[in-house]
A protein has these predicted regions:
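ATP/NTP phosphate-donor binding region
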Residues: 1-100
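Glycine/threonine-rich beta-strand-loop-alpha-helix active-site module
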Residues: 78-135
Length: 135
């Protein structure tokens, strides 16, 4: 696995690439975002069918709690209705400012869930597990 850090204006972002990263998602989240123990896993419906349980198992193995929230595939994930639905489901599940959002899917999923993470409760930590090159 390769890791590198991207320096932004006020923040840094660690990028992990390589074989086995998906199975190590939980351990990597614990390492890089240690203050978060509960994650809202926002996943594209199609991607979740293949990798959702695998990622949730990785989070459980790392001692992290997660709950899966499905998003529509593609650009339909970025509609106001989909965003409101995601935010309501996350909040109705008892998530608070101590929680984070992790995305599993392509660019539209990352955009929609990233916007939810930025706007929920004045912003919560966000991590991405992209499944496409553009994501």
């Amino acid at each position: 696995m390769e890791q590198f850090t991207v320096q932004l204006n006020n923040a840094t972002c660690t990028v992990c690439i390589g074989a086995g990263v998906l199975g190590r998602a939980g351990a990597l989240l614990r390492q890089h975002v240690p203050q978060v123990r509960r994650w809202a896993l926002a996943a594209d419906e199609a991607v979740s069918a293949f990798y959702g349980e695998w990622v949730q198992g990785s989070l459980r193995a790392a001692g992290l709690e997660s709950r899966l929230f499905l998003l529509p595939q593609g650009e339909s994930a970025k509609t106001p209705e989909a965003w409101v639905s995601l935010c309501r489901r996350i909040l109705d599940s008892g998530f608070d400012r101590s929680c984070g959002v992790v995305t599993l899917g392509g660019g539209a999923c990352g955009d929609a869930a990233g916007f939810a993470a930025a706007s929920l409760l004045r912003g919560v930590p966000l991590a991405h597990i992209p499944t496409t090159l553009l994501a």
